[in-house]
Structure formats: C-alpha cells, structure tokens
Amino acid sequence: MSENRAPIYLDNNATTRTDPSVVQTMLPFFTEQFGNASSAHAFGNEAAIAVRQARRSLSGLLGSAYDHEIVFTSGGTEANNAAILSALATQEGRDEVVTTSVEHSAVLALTEQLAARGVKTRIIAVDACGRLDIEAFRCALGPRTAIASVMWANNETGTIFPVKCLAGWTREAGALFHTDAVQAIGKVRLNLKDSTIDMLSLSAHKLHGPKGVGALYLRKGTKFQPLICGGSQERGRRAGTENIPGIVGLGKAAELAAERLEPERIRIGALRDRLEQGILRNGECVVLGDIRNRLANTTNIAFDHLEGEAIAHRLNRAGIAVSLGSACRSGSMQPSHVLRAMQVPAWRMHGAVRFSLSRETSLAEVDEAVCAVSDIVTRMRASSRATVREQTS
C-alpha cells in the first residue's frame, strides 16, 4: 500500500461523511436565514418554509402518504424511545412489548428499563443467519400487546427483516408496529403508504446527512403522546425550537438518497461482493448473517480463531477504518449481542469484523482493503502457528 494514499473509510454503518452539497445547503441557516420557525416575521417565515420543504423531501424518500406524518427529532434514539413509550401510554389495556434479540441498544436498553418497571417484554429469537423466528413472533402477539418493534435491517450483519408482513400481523392483533429503519433509510425503498407500519425511526447521519437530527414517521391517525413536552412545535408532537440547519440538511440528504438509491444499491452491492470474495479467498473465514437478504453495503466477516479487535487495530494503523459492530457499544468488552443471539461460536464470534460501504466507496478502495486484510490475516495466522509450534516443541 502507498504510504501517501488517503485513508479508506469502511465503517459507514456507524456514520457517513456529510455530503458536501448537504453542508452547502445548511450553511445559510446558521448565519443568514437564522430565524426561529415559530416566529411571526420574515426570518421566521424563511425558516418555516425550509422546514416544510425538508419534510416534503423526507416524506418522498419514505413514500409516506402525507408530509405531516414526519416528526423531526434529535436522532434515531429519541425516535425509538418516543415510539415505544407513546404506544405504552396510549394503547389502553395493553402493556406488553414485543421485540427481537438483535435490536439496536436504543431499543433493547429501553425495554430492559421497562421490564424493571414491570412492563412485560417478549424477546423473539433469531436463527444462525440472524433471521427472525416468524412463528414465535406471531405467537407472541396477543390482546395485551401494545407495540411490536422490529428493526428494518440489522446494523451489524445487514440482515433485512420482513417488516411489512410483521406489521400486518401486528395490526391484526390490534397493536401498533414500529420499525427502527436507521440502517435501512436510503439503502432500500420503503414505500410506507403501501404498508401498515405505524411508526418508523431514522437518523440523518446514516445517509450522508448531519449528526444530531432524525425523524419519527407517525402514520396519520396513530395516537401519540410526546416524549418531550413544552412548546407546540411539530404539531405538538415534539417540543423545542427546531434545529433548522439540521432539518434542512436531512431534507437535502433525503433528496440525494432518493435520486441515487437504485443505481447506488446495485453498484455498492457489486463492490461488497468483490470485497467479500477477495477476503474469503484467504480461507478460514465466513460471512455472518443472511447472505440472500441483506443490505447491499454490509458484510460481517468472521476470521476463525483470530481476534477481530486485533485485525481492526492493524487495519486502522494501515489507514483503513472498519468496526467490530455497533459504534454505540464501542469500548464494551462484551461480545456482540447480535452474534450471541445468532449463537455464533466464541472462536468465530471473537474474529468478526464489519465492513460497511457507501456511495463514496470506490473500486480502488475495495481492492486496497482486500490486499490489506489478506496481508494482515496471513501474518497473524503465521504468527499464531509459530507460537503453537514453540509451545509444542
């Protein structure tokens, strides 16, 4: 590898680079069009118009029936919390939550807290490929279910869940259905108006938008109790002065994603496959997750009997950014809860490394990464074999 080349970023499921055109769209709203959208003067009117346009753009990406079904938030975590807590507060006579064992910590940490308060949570298992036990999900729904919350796509393996089918069964049971679509947004077509999904969470920074802003899709007619109280912003559904630059950035990011989604999905999928094939040629490694139904940008590769942390560290020193899983659990010494739920053996689980691409990833970067991984893994295995020989001689 050339010592002068630019760093290679393959951790796009953690966050993405804000698109330069998104930044340019945001800039005037810091210093020129800086009004409060609730103010009754020209500055406020400019801000209000910008928010309406962003709402329209995001509604278009989601395929929602009405622009006002979009509620802007500080991000996916807030949206997840708002959806689940609202369902428990508004679904009279229903006090149970159904979710899965592989959800993001923004959902699982909340359900653990709710369980400590006496709220019954039914956790549905997945199989060795990370696919949901569909029959167990259907059986878990009942007259006391307030909400079922299932992610659209897993952030660690990319496995896609059949959320539209799950939403239909949930509605038949009289409960609300929520999906955490933070990883899916901008990568798959959602078309919410053709579904029975009641609520959906998303975050701007996963689709080349700014950090600190997201949204909750709230289907028209769905009862909702705000998580944050105060002013009447967002039709009384989320109090607080709107983050106008962030909302504008999210709107622009949504426009770009809608324009490029299908061609980029195909291109990125081909690059992901090339990356996988190049790495798998080294042997003693395997792709984790559902390889037939996953996000085009994501691959989680386990290097048998090696430490993924050591591989990621060496790649970082070589200027290549990857991760072991969710950045939100970075620093934790516990193995991935997703891989544990999939019952991946310890000798394989500890060698897992996630590679996640974006529309900015190039063919040259993928080939460079394959060479770097191959070199690092070859050296680590040679060192391991030498150590074994020394110990047995």
UniProtKB/Swiss-Prot annotation:
Enzyme Commission numbers on file: 2.8.1.7
GO biological process terms held by the UniProt record: amino acid metabolic process; nitrogen fixation
Catalysed reactions listed for this entry: (sulfur carrier)-H + L-cysteine = (sulfur carrier)-SH + L-alanine
Residues given in the record as pyridoxal 5'-phosphate binding sites: 76-77, 155, 183, 203-205, 241
Active site: 328
One MF term in the entry's GO annotations: pyridoxal phosphate binding
Enzyme class: transferase
Ligand binding ([2Fe-2S] cluster): 328
N6-(pyridoxal phosphate)lysine modifications at: 206
Keywords from the UniProt entry: Iron, Iron-sulfur, Metal-binding, Nitrogen fixation, Pyridoxal phosphate, Transferase
Role description: Catalyzes the removal of elemental sulfur atoms from cysteine to produce alanine. Seems to participate in the biosynthesis of the nitrogenase metalloclusters by providing the inorganic sulfur required for the Fe-S core formation.
Family: Belongs to the class-V pyridoxal-phosphate-dependent aminotransferase family. NifS/IscS subfamily.
NCBIfam families: FeS_nifS
Protein name: Cysteine desulfurase
